[in-house]
């Protein structure tokens, strides 16, 4: 009863909430002998920031990306990933605030020419194979995702045109159980996808499991500063309780 009441409250309070699904709720594809393969371009593309558009804050000619202080681990990982997969040593710049940026004119020209049009929009037609879609989704999960419980995951992007690619990929890869929430009226506005990941998706997510845990730990530590002090401690308890209720509701929806 309590979970049902929460769902009703959530439905009334959310600006926009929908449950997307395929027409069939069949058995997920077998993953026992399924082999994962990462396409470097599309994994990297999945991680890229595009707040207010890909080139609003990123230099198209020479920059790969920019990162928040809590994303130091991903900046270092991406620099290493590029060196191993492209044989390019990037220029990683850390400023006093611990924000960071990665530069490589050669790689920037390559990926921005191949995968973005003249107006800076991602070329969707390049996502033309399962390997590319899984690779892109894995990159998105690494930077923008969260493992909530069991096979339930969350992906959240802010003021990003990437939302349409995320939804289409989840649909194409037969993610039948998906809840979408749009936070309208917030700064920034956000698109949130709650999903029950398929066994094949989980295999891909596990590739980056250790790195994701490190990033999540850094994020939690960064956000934890908000909950310092007596009032902060109370707010943290309330936040944790809401998270537990959310997970219960998602479990009920996905049942």
Predicted region positions:
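DNA-contacting interfaces and partner/effector-binding or oligomerization modules
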Residues: 46, 64-76, 80-215
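Acidic/histidine-rich, surface-exposed loop or edge segments in extracytoplasmic proteins
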Residues: 57-61
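Extended mid-to-C-terminal alpha-helical interaction segments
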Residues: 209-255
């Amino acid at each position: 009863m309590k979970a049902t009441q929460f769902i009703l409250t959530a439905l009334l309070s959310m600006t926009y909430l929908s449950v997307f699904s395929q027409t069939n709720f069949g058995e997920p594809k077998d993953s026992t002998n399924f082999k994962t393969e990462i396409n470097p371009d599309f994994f990297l593309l999945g991680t890229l920031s595009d707040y207010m558009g890909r080139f609003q804050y990123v230099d198209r000619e020479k920059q790969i990306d920019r990162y928040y202080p809590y994303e130091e681990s991903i900046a270092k990982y991406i620099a290493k990933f590029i060196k191993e997969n492209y044989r390019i040593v990037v220029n990683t710049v850390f400023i006093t605030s611990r924000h960071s940026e990665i530069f490589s004119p050669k790689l920037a020209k390559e990926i921005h020419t191949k995968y973005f049009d003249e107006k800076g929009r991602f070329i969707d037609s390049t996502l033309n194979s399962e390997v590319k879609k899984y690779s892109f989704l894995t990159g998105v999960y690494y930077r923008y995702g969260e493992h909530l419980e069991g096979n339930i995951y969350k992906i959240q992007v802010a003021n990003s045109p990437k939302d349409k690619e995320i939804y289409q990929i989840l649909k194409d890869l037969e993610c039948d159980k998906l809840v979408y929430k749009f936070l309208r009226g917030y700064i920034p506005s956000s698109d949130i996808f709650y999903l029950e990941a398929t066994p094949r998706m989980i295999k891909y997510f596990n590739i980056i499991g250790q790195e994701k845990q490190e990033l999540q730990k850094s994020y939690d530590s960064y956000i934890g500063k908000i909950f310092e002090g007596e009032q902060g401690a109370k707010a943290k308890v309330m936040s944790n309780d809401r998270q537990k209720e959310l997970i219960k509701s998602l479990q009920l929806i996905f049942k």
